[in-house]
């Protein structure tokens, strides 16, 4: 069936936003590579924020210069930037394949509004716009780190983290109720490319994005607490504990959000838990690398215990999610009634439920006559 003018307009907007996404991705890949060379306008190497060998956990911040607190060093920051852009590249391939699938599926549209519904199932124009903003904010973050503006960097990354959280939630829920999201997927014919994109490729991309969200939550906690530590006259050790405990609390909140809401849309959500496990390894590296500094400050054991609680909570949440996925398999899912009513054929004649004796009517007539005579 031919699509409506509204659906054609949404398709054109969606394809144009995809072109903007491709352009922004190219600039986002070029920027961190160019930022590694000082002669291209970047004053400092963004991966190395401060000299963490001068970390002193027993002192308070100094207003004259940047006080080093717990943050990622060059190898960890390089891993995060590389992994996030690899995921963005996979997302670009996903959207490109989805665009081809939607254009090819136009001739299979069963109704006037089917095309816009399929675009919503793949990723709405609003979702693409948020993806463009995500790439733009990560570019700003690299710029601000290169100029050592930690306050502006913390603010920019806060925006990036919030965009990433909202993007992931909208990506999973399709910005609709559970019933509507399920019905959107049911309208796609099974024998076309779009069906495989929505039902196979999209859940994989969701889990990959969730792993990136876990790493971005760690960067947000460290950036936010570094800005706090250089804004107030506090102990550096308090900032270290604050960053670790903040990263312990935020994933726990996400675990509850997953179990009570997001799992209804995507039961097999395991990417965030694996991302938290990788982030906890990244977080423990400074403790191992600067073991003497933490031991001298007498907070080595407390920091190690707090960091160890992060993967422990992630493993417990992962076990709960796996158990719920296994138990939900045994539940009977709702299925719609058949469109055509089924006819029932009886092979035997229907027997009456109550039987009456052949002479019962005679007795009734006699009783009525005697009553009348009296």
From Swiss-Prot:
One Gene Ontology cellular component: membrane
Virion surface side: 38-82, 139-149, 229-238, 291-301
Region feature Disordered, mapped onto this chain: 345-374
Intravirion side: 1-16, 104-117, 171-207, 260-269, 323-374
Keyword terms of this UniProt record: Disulfide bond, Glycoprotein, Host endosome, Host Golgi apparatus, Host membrane, Host nucleus, Membrane, Transmembrane, Transmembrane helix, Viral envelope protein, Virion
Domain of life: Viruses
Keyword Membrane found: yes
Major location (coarse): virion
Stretches with biased composition (Acidic residues): 364-374
Coiled-coil region: none
Cellular compartments annotated: Virion membrane; Host Golgi apparatus, Host trans-Golgi network; Host endosome membrane; Host nucleus inner membrane
Transmembrane regions: 17-37, 83-103, 118-138, 150-170, 208-228, 239-259, 270-290, 302-322
This protein's record includes keyword Transferase: no
Cited InterPro entries: Herpes_glycop_M
Database matches in HAMAP family: HSV_GM (MF_04035)
Functional summary from the UniProt entry: Envelope glycoprotein important for virion assembly and egress. Plays a role in the correct incorporation of gH-gL into virion membrane. Directs the glycoprotein N (gN) to the host trans-Golgi network.
Assembly and interaction partners: Interacts (via N-terminus) with gN (via N-terminus). The gM-gN heterodimer forms the gCII complex.
Entry domain remark: The highly charged and proline-rich cytoplasmic tail might interact with the virion tegument.
Protein family according to the UniProt entry: Belongs to the herpesviridae glycoprotein M family.
Record protein name field: Envelope glycoprotein M
Designated gene of the protein: gM
């Amino acid at each position: 069936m031919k699509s409506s003018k509204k659906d054609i307009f949404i398709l054109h907007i969606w394809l144009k936003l995809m072109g903007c996404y491709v352009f922004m991705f190219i600039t986002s890949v070029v920027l961190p590579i160019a930022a590694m060379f000082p002669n291209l306008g970047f004053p400092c190497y963004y991966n190395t924020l401060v000299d963490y060998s001068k970390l002193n956990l027993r002192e308070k911040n100094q207003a004259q210069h940047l006080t080093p607190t717990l943050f990622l060093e060059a190898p960890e920051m390089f891993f995060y930037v590389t992994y996030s852009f690899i995921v963005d590249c996979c997302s670009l391939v996903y959207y490109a394949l989805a665009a081809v699938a939607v254009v090819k599926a136009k001739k299979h549209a069963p109704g006037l509004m089917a095309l816009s519904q399929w675009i919503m199932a793949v990723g709405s124009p609003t979702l693409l716009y948020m993806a463009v903003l995500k790439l733009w904010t990560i570019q700003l973050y690299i710029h601000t780190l290169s100029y050592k503006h930690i306050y502006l960097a913390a603010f920019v990354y806060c925006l990036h983290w919030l965009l990433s959280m909202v993007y992931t939630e909208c990506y999973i829920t399709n910005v609709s109720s559970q019933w509507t999201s399920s019905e959107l997927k049911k309208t796609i014919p099974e024998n076309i490319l779009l069906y495989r994109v929505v039902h196979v490729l999209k859940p994989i991309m969701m889990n990959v994005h969730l792993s990136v969200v876990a790493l971005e939550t760690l960067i947000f906690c460290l950036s936010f607490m570094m800005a706090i530590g250089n804004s107030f006259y506090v102990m550096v050790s308090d900032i270290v504990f604050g960053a670790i405990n903040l990263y312990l609390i935020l994933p726990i909140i996400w675990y509850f959000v997953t179990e009570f809401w997001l799992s209804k849309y995507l039961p097999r959500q395991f990417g965030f838990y694996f991302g938290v496990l990788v982030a906890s390894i990244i977080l423990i590296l400074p403790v191992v690398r600067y073991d003497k500094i933490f031991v001298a400050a007498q907070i080595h054991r407390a920091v190690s215990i707090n960091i160890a609680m992060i993967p422990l909570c992630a493993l417990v949440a992962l076990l709960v999610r796996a158990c719920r996925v296994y138990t939900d398999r045994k539940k009977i899912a709702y299925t719609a009634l058949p469109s055509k009513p089924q006819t029932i054929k009886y092979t035997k004649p229907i027997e009456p439920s109550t039987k009456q004796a052949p002479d019962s009517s005679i007795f009734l007539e006699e009783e009525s006559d005697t009553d009348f005579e009296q």
